[in-house]
Every structure is written in C-alpha cells, then in structure tokens.
C-alpha cells in the first residue's frame, strides 16, 4: 500500500462549506459514526425528520468500509487517486488496500480528524486551493454527490481537469435523475433539530454532466449504474 504525504494545510476555510457552522449536524454524526442527515434547499427548509424525496446523507456508510460498488469504481481506476470531498476516508482506505497511491482532501475539520485518526493520508483543504499535482492524478473522484461542491459544477470540473493527468479520468457519481441540473443554497439538518449554515451546492444528473464536462474540457468516456448509483467516467477531451 502506498500513501501520499498528507502535509498539514494552513489554509483557512470558511464555515460556509458543506454542512459547516450552525448546529453542526455533520460533525455530530461523524462523532457518532452514524446518523441520517437531510440535504435540502435553504429556503423553507424546516427542521423536520428526514423525509423521502430529499437527499439523505448516510454517515454510517461514509464512515464505514467501501462496499462492492465502491470497490468496482476503484477496479476501474488508475493511480494515483485523489478523492475530492473524501469525508472520513473510506475511498482513500479502499484505494490503499487495492495498492493504489491515494490522497483525500476535505474542508471538514471533523472529517479530516476522523480520517487521520485512522492513519489515512488526508488534507484539510479545498479542491480550489493548493493541491499536489506532480505529473497529474490518474483518477480524481467526485463521489457521493460531491460534484455539487461549491454550487458550480462547470467550475469544479474545470478545476478537476487541471488536476487530472492527460491519460487519467475524473469519476463522478451523479444524481439518479439524468436530466437533473440545479444549483442552490443548501442546508443540512438532522432528526435532533441541528441545522448547518447555508452553503452553495448543486445536483447534476448524467445527461447534464456531459454539458458541464464539455465546458470544462472533458468528455464522457463511459457510464454505469450499480445498486441504484450512477457513475460517469470523464476523460480529457482530445
């Protein structure tokens, strides 16, 4: 197993990142190692039990081991692997177990702390900040809806295009509705009534992703669906 050096970041990150600030429901769930959170538009997002039809964040899955669908993603990957929005590090851990050099980055102090406590190479850093590039990343991962980071899918993909090697790929897990394409101010809430500060987010389906990718200089290489999860492999446009 090969880990990349997780040099400590001195970057100051704003509290209005994914699920940050406010009542800190994401941090509470990470501390518990479990919990169902709801991601919903900030406007009119009352603090209610997690309902059907909203984006449900399964922290137990994020904090647990990679499942068979995750492992298949890594079987299609080439190293080194950069997991953007890595959370507590399940994909970094799985990549290392598969013999792929890997590094995770996340803006959540709590998530990075959990990952580092497990001995994983994870940086407290934004993808839009300084990220080690060297000769380029073999695979950049945007899983678990992380194509929504920053509320600007085209901008995020353009940044990933800068990081990926010419022979590499950006693997994106998309919204199950192929045509979905919306950016919005979101909040995360939990059943205990905790609520994050609003943050910029987006939801993108596989069809809409192709348009954002084209604007970023990327092209669709392949798509697949496993266990209700949809993935798109993007490669640098020729």
Language model regions located:
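S-adenosyl-L-methionine
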Residues: 2-76
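Conserved class I S-adenosyl-L-methionine
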Residues: 78-87
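A short acidic, Gly/Pro-enriched loop at the edge of an enzyme's catalytic core
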Residues: 130-140
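A short, conserved alpha-helix within the catalytic core of class I
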Residues: 148-160
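Short alpha-helix
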Residues: 199-217
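Conserved SAM/SAH-binding beta-strand->alpha-helix loop
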Residues: 108
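Conserved beta-strand signature within the Rossmann-like core of class I S-adenosyl-L-methionine
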Residues: 167-175
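Conserved SAM-binding strand-loop segment of SAM-dependent methyltransferases
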Residues: 119-129
